[in-house]
Amino acid sequence: MIIKRSPQNPILKPLREHGWEAEATFNPCPAIKGKDIFLLYRAISMPHYHNLARNNIITSDIGIAQSKNGYNFFNRKKFIIPEKNWEQFGCEDPRVTKLNDKYFIFYTALSKYPFQADGIKVGLAISKDLKNIQEKHLVTPFNAKAMALFPEKINGQIWAILSVHTDKPPTKICLVSFNKESDIWSEKFWNNWYANFEKYALPLQRNKNDFIEVGTPPLKTKYGWLIFYSYIYNYFSPNRLFGIEAVLLDLKNPFKILARTEYPILTAEEYYEKIGLVPNVVFPSGAFIKNDWIYLYYGGADMVGCLALINLRIFLEEILKNDEKKPKLERFSHNPILLSRQENSWEKKAVLNPGAIYLNNKVHLIYRAISEDDVSTFGYAQSSNGYHIDWRSDQPVYIPRESFEKRDNPNVSCGCEDPRLTKIGNKIYMGYTAYDGHIPRIALTSINVKSFLNQQWQDWAKPILISPTDLNDKDMVIFPEKFQGQYLIVHRVGYDIDYSFSKNLNFGEGKWLEENRWIYCRPGWWDSKKLGAAAPPIKTKKGWILFYHGISENNVYRVGAVLLDLKNPIKILSRTSKPLLEPEMPYEKEGLVNNVVFPCGAVEINGKIFVYYGGADQVIGGATIDLNKLLQIFKTDKMY
């Protein structure tokens, strides 16, 4: 998704000299008045003695600040303070909408201390000029938060969105419509509505263990009402994840969901989102549109106010695009292209994860084969058109030769796994995972191109280990060119994709791959748990394409890609927001390891990219994508 944090972040910070906003200033919501932008925000005071609480507590007021540009704010002052008994312990999290020349400011009103669900309700302040408050009302007679009006009437009615039962889950994000303004604070109206509130809920929750809450007041676009909301994954777990998502509702019938994001567009990554009163929080609270850009305001770690910018046009195109129409890797119609052969003991159990290289107008595959007794070796196959296998070896072309790829216990697996092939000069380098039943490490060997083409497999060089001792390291690929006189090697220690530069390919005791963390997992996404490079990068006029596999929290393997700068490939230009390939076919969903697509090879032939992958750790499949279509995806998913 196209989103970038403001370099001025955090745009709103506590002021120690203002006791009422000395602890935190967050969850800001903007309102436009003339040429100025006013920001309403929650302000937390220094601890002080509260007569009604009979205790030293911190309290919340709602502040207001002014700006000419949306990120530099001045003239900060209190705006909404606890005055009524239904808000006597604090006013929190404002959401402001201008309707009929008045500013309707909904906020969380706290009436009880210690805080409890039946004392947490929605309050409303109405202002004509953002200087003074003309009216205040208690809105909901039940536990609710995060209410906001739509900025215009729909079918002659006033509409609003709110979160019901935020403090006694499950929470519902609901819609409500009013015939007249006074209905907004009518207790009778709300009691009738509340009796069947669940029928007014939007189905946004994916899992019963997740938590949702309204974020921004609705934004009108030509395609629909756009609302950003908080989606908290695994809310009741210590590993909960705060994310920001979005939904697009029909302009005339807001109950109709036109589109929504599949993954969070923002999670806590920056220090001001990770460190605060409540760590690791991003919480959307307000937005406006200017010059085709969405200015999205959010709270960071319940401490500061922040701003992110989103390209409106591209964002809407992305969430509205039908997944079936979006370019993806297209499987060969005759998949799987390689199966295990029961007559060959060395590949009887499975064939999978092929490396690929294009030489002399043929695609050459070196694939992993697993024997009955769980020893992995490499087989060979070739194709003249990239789609169909013309010939396949009857014997393994590479076997475990060194102690670091042989087992000392017959009850564990071992061998040579997951080959990747790169041609540099007149040599083909093959990196693979060497496994002795204890620690998987990266091994490197090579063979002369002529020997490879002549299938003189005895010419493979003696393999060497290039990853550190006692460190789990896998998924190694080498760039086919040097950069400033150095080789660039991609590998994986832990969960992210790493890189290492080396002046040469001579490794051994005292010289191992370095771990420079590079491409990270994206929390809440399809690649949230673990990443690994798939195939050696492909050079194009727009940059290097590096395919990778990503694993989700429910252990599904999918395929994505990044576009890297031609001269400085450490610089990531773009990353696919959606998977290019995911387990859908029976041979990908069921096997030795279910729900796996795992490429180790990719080649470009006449403007088309061929990707070769293992399916469910048992068979081999192929898929293609037009190079220009993939580059267009990268253009959409451009990173800032």
Predicted regions and their residues:
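Short Gly/charged-rich anion-binding patches and loops
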Residues: 532
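Electrostatic interaction modules used in gene-expression and signaling proteins
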Residues: 287-289, 602-604
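C-terminal structured domain segments
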Residues: 280, 594-595, 599
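Beta-rich carbohydrate-recognition and catalytic domains
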Residues: 1-23, 27-89, 98-148, 152-210, ...
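Structural signature of WD-repeat beta-propeller blades
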Residues: 92, 147, 216, 285, ...
